[in-house]
UniProtKB/Swiss-Prot annotation:
Protein name: Small ribosomal subunit protein uS12c
GO CC term (a single one): ribonucleoprotein complex
UniProtKB keywords: Chloroplast, Plastid, Ribonucleoprotein, Ribosomal protein, RNA-binding, rRNA-binding
Localization in the cell: Plastid, Chloroplast
InterPro entries reported in the protein's UniProt record: NA-bd_OB-fold (IPR012340)
Gene Ontology terms, MF aspect: rRNA binding
UniProt organism field: Pinus contorta (Shore pine)
């Protein structure tokens, strides 16, 4: 358990859940999810 002074110096950041494919965020057509067929 951290001391009060440590908590004041750097407050705890909430752990953010990681996205499964961060590299494909800008390119949805490479993700393998097909929303529409042309």
């Amino acid at each position: 358990m951290p001391t009060i002074q440590q908590l004041i110096r750097n407050a705890r950041q909430p752990i953010e859940n990681r996205k499964k494919s961060p590299a494909l965020r800008g390119c949805p057509q490479r993700r393998g999810v097909c929303a529409r067929v042309y």
